[in-house]
């Protein structure tokens, strides 16, 4: 019998990775938990903006995918400083054995932004690449990965990947 007394959260979240894919899922599974993020955004004019954010990763959809929620400024700071620069987005990541890579779908409904990428391990790093608009590539990299910290780098290419420009960097530490 269908249990209709479960919440959406109960139906979405999983306690662990799905056993059939557990080894492959650890590429992003290593991030499951809560993180503090120091964020630096670099605008095209060279100016920089800083924010303290939070980033939460968890198992979802029968443990076959990982969802994260990325928030900046951190919720505890939202009332203290008016900040026109903000984000409240989410990413779904799921492994596709047919291509031995990850599908990534990120969206920020408050700013009406979305991006699809393909992600793969690159040595000790993780690299995700997708097209944000015709001819414009976005590359997101997880680097310097340790048990309690990592660095995330967002690059943009206006020439289909010939050259890249850093536009955002985050240093994350486990909360």
What is each model feature region?
Residues 1-175:
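Hydrophobic small-molecule pocket/channel-lining residues, especially in calycin-type beta-barrels
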């Amino acid at each position: 019998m269908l249990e209709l007394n479960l919440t959406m959260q109960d139906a979405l979240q999983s306690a662990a990775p799905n056993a059939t894919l557990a080894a492959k899922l650890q590429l992003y599974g290593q991030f499951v938990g809560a993180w503090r993020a120091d964020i630096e955004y670099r605008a095209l004019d060279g100016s920089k903006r800083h924010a303290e954010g939070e980033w939460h990763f968890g198992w979802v959809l029968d443990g076959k995918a990982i969802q994260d929620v990325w928030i900046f400024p951190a919720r505890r700071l939202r009332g203290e400083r008016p900040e026109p620069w903000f984000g409240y987005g989410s990413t779904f990541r799921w492994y596709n054995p047919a291509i031995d890579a990850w599908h990534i779908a990120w969206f920020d409904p408050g700013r009406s932004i979305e991006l699809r990428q393909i992600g793969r391990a690159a040595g000790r790093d993780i690299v995700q690449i997708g097209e944000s608009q015709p001819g414009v590539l976005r590359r997101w990299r997880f680097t310097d990965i340790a048990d309690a910290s990592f660095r995330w780098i967002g690059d943009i290419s206006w020439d289909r990947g010939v050259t890249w420009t850093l536009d955002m960097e985050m240093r994350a530490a486990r909360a």
